[in-house]
Swiss-Prot record:
Keywords: Ribonucleoprotein, Ribosomal protein
Superkingdom, natural source: Archaea
BP term (GO), one: translation
One Gene Ontology cellular component annotation held by this UniProt entry: ribosome
Similarity comment: family membership: Belongs to the eukaryotic ribosomal protein eL34 family.
UniProt cross-references to PANTHER family, sorted A to Z: 60S RIBOSOMAL PROTEIN L34
Organism this protein belongs to: Pyrococcus horikoshii (strain ATCC 700860 / DSM 12428 / JCM 9974 / NBRC 100139 / OT-3)
GO molecular function: structural constituent of ribosome
Keyword Protease: no
Region Disordered: start-end pairs: 48-69
Organism lineage: Archaea, Methanobacteriati, Methanobacteriota, Thermococci, Thermococcales
NCBIfam families recorded: PRK04059.1
Name this protein carries in UniProt: Large ribosomal subunit protein eL34
């Protein structure tokens, strides 16, 4: 095993070869799941991928196509209601 693969930053994947041997393949780990910027809940619709993998995806597959995709739907509604209420109070 190469010294660079001894650290746990590489994921170990056990693969059975056509000859019947079991060998170890090393892969980079996937990043953590995206979380809401306000409440911290995990976000749906955002894939877990390394930057190299994310670069290959189209823009619509990287994040939801709605206002404030970095917030969960509950927090997004709350923020939008606050913005609308503040506009109503001004006008």
């Amino acid at each position: 095993m190469k010294p660079m693969y001894r650290s746990r930053s590489w994921r170990r994947k056990y693969v059975r070869t056509p000859g019947g041997r079991v060998v170890v393949h090393f892969e980079r780990k996937k990043p953590k799941i995206a979380h809401c910027a306000i409440c911290g809940r995990p976000l749906n619709g955002i894939p877990r991928g390394r930057p190299v993998e994310m670069r290959k995806l189209p823009k619509t597959k990287k994040r939801p196509e709605r206002p404030m995709p970095y917030l969960c739907p509950r927090c997004m509604r709350r923020v939008m209601k606050e913005q609308i209420r503040s506009q109503i109070m001004k006008g």
